[in-house]
């Protein structure tokens, strides 16, 4: 939300209106869009307590709390469901969750696919009683959908939920780090989940940058990374369309093949 507001403010002099932004949520299995922000209306931002979110609860932040305060998390609404479509948020056991509780997003409606071509196993896994299991985590508040991340990407350390995108975005703001080319994921260390960071950066003082990343992650998320890999520019894998291949850095790390400027 901060970047969107900054963009709208910068180009307001040229006649740009913030209401031109149309946040939405969708996927190919639903013939793209599932929810859409009403045209011509200002975007809706939810300000929640960051600590509560670690427990899966989108509790409203204290009134008057500064948006830049680490205890406050802002999420942009992805809009409301299209007519004839339904949303449901469920727990790991499939129980329907109340508003402001984070769970897996399910949807059903006339645009949802009946299944995957010649892949019955994938169809059975994704579609149950007509409900498409999206694999995305989110919550609903006042009819609006808020997306938090991917279920399979969720990092759970000491019982607290951490969304890798939040960690990656924060690290990406550090000088020298290539924004959008940061990956946070968890690995098993002696039976416990541990955090690993891989970040592309310009060649320089990798040791100092690791310390900056360690401080940032500790101060904002209360976590201590087990390993921080400073990777040369262009080494972290992406798809042909520029999307992050989130599984690849984890696989490279586990195989000991993640290229680095220098070893720790």
For each feature predicted by the language model, list its residue ranges.
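Conserved AMP-binding/adenylate-forming
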Residues: 2-144, 152-154
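Extended hydrophobic secondary-structure segments that form protein cores and membrane-embedded regions
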Residues: 21-25, 105, 197-199, 228-231
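A short beta-turn/loop motif at secondary-structure boundaries
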Residues: 26, 187-191, 234
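Residue-level signal for well-ordered, solvent-exposed loop/turn and beta-edge residues enriched
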Residues: 88, 95, 144-146, 160, ...
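AMP-binding/adenylate-forming catalytic core of the ANL superfamily
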Residues: 109, 114-115, 120, 125, ...
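Conserved C-terminal "lid"/linker of ANL adenylate-forming enzymes
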Residues: 181-185, 196-197, 214-264
């Amino acid at each position: 939300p901060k970047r969107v507001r900054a963009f709208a403010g910068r180009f307001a002099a040229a006649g740009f209106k913030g209401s031109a932004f149309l946040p939405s949520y969708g996927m190919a299995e639903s013939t793209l869009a599932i929810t859409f922000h009403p045209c011509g209306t200002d975007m809706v931002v939810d300000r929640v307590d960051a600590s509560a979110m670690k427990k899966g609860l989108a509790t409203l932040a204290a009134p008057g709390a500064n948006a830049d305060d680490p205890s406050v998390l802002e999420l942009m609404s992805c809009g409301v469901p299209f007519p004839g479509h339904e949303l449901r948020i469920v727990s790991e056991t499939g129980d329907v969750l109340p508003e402001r509780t984070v769970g897996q997003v399910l949807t059903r409606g006339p645009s949802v696919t009946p299944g995957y071509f010649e892949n019955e196993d994938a169809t059975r896994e994704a579609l149950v009683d007509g409900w498409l299991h999206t694999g995305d985590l989110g919550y609903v508040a006042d009819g609006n959908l808020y997306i938090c991340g991917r279920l399979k990407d969720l990092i759970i350390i000491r019982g607290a939920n951490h969304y890798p995108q939040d960690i990656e975005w924060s690290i990406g703001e550090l000088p020298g780090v290539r924004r959008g080319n940061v990956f946070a994921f968890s690995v098993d260390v002696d039976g416990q989940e541990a955090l690993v960071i891989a970040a592309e950066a310009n060649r320089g003082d990798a040791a100092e940058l690791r310390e900056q990343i360690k401080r940032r992650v500790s101060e904002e998320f209360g976590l201590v990374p087990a390993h921080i890999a400073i990777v040369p520019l262009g080494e972290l894998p992406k798809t042909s369309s520029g999307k992050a291949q989130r599984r690849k850095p984890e696989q490279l790390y586990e195989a000991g093949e993640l290229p680095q400027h220098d070893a720790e």
